[in-house]
């Protein structure tokens, strides 16, 4: 599903570039915004890409980008754990995220009438994650289970072995999901250090595709971030 949505968004942007109907703007905070209005259906996708992934990790914190991605959905100072999920689900939203070697991205697809609410929650999640220790330990178990599952998947093992042969010294050698040894022991402070280093608006690209007014969408992003 994550791969399908990523391809879908990129196809939309490619189509926008071809048609010349998209708008790209750099905000005063350094954030890049891309807006492509499509009025065919009353729906909109907000997708923020952070220019960081496992390539920006070290051998000591490998897997932190993916682990942090899981933790962004665990509440903020304004919205306790579960509150955002409740609000967005009540409005028919689809929310997800993905981490790769080069980037991490988070998206919301929602009826366009709730665009302002979605953008406010989206920015709050990306800028003010709370990462409660209790939730961190829950997600630690989830990620460790994912690592164990990957270790028992033949196709994944083939990919990892090929990756090891191709990248012996390059940062691409690191697995996006990390290792059980590191994920099992990494501290909350280390995760927050990574967040503080890379999750600034100047390191983000926010795409808005769907039933929106370009100027209003850009103004809302600037207000929210």
Model regions: which residues?
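Sec-dependent N-terminal signal peptides
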Residues: 4-14
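Boundary at the C-terminal end of the N-terminal hydrophobic targeting segment
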Residues: 17-21
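M16/MPP (pitrilysin/insulinase) zinc-metallopeptidase core fold and M16-derived inactive scaffolds
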Residues: 40, 45-109, 175-177
């Amino acid at each position: 599903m994550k791969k399908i949505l990523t391809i879908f968004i990129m196809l939309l942007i490619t189509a926008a570039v071809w048609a010349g109907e998209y708008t790209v703007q750099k905000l005063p905070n350094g954030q890049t915004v891309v807006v492509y209005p499509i009025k065919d259906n009353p729906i909109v996708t907000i997708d923020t890409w952070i220019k960081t992934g496992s390539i920006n990790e070290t051998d000591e914190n490998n897997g932190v980008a993916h682990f942090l991605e899981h933790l962004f959905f665990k509440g903020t100072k304004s919205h306790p754990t579960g509150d955002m999920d409740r609000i967005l689900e009540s409005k028919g939203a689809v929310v997800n995220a993905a981490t790769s070697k080069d980037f991490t991205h988070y998206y919301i697809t929602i009826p366009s009438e709730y665009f302002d609410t979605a953008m406010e929650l989206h920015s709050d999640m990306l800028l003010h994650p709370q990462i409660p220790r209790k939730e961190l330990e829950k997600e630690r178990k989830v990620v460790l289970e994912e690592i164990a599952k990957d270790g028992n998947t033949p196709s994944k093992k083939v990919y990892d072995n090929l990756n090891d042969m191709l990248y012996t010294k390059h940062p691409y050698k690191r697995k996006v999901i990390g290792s059980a040894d590191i994920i099992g022991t990494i501290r909350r402070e280390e995760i927050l250090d990574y967040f503080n280093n890379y999750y600034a608006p100047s390191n983000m690209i926010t795409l808005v595709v769907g039933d929106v007014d370009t100027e209003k969408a850009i103004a809302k992003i600037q207000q929210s971030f």
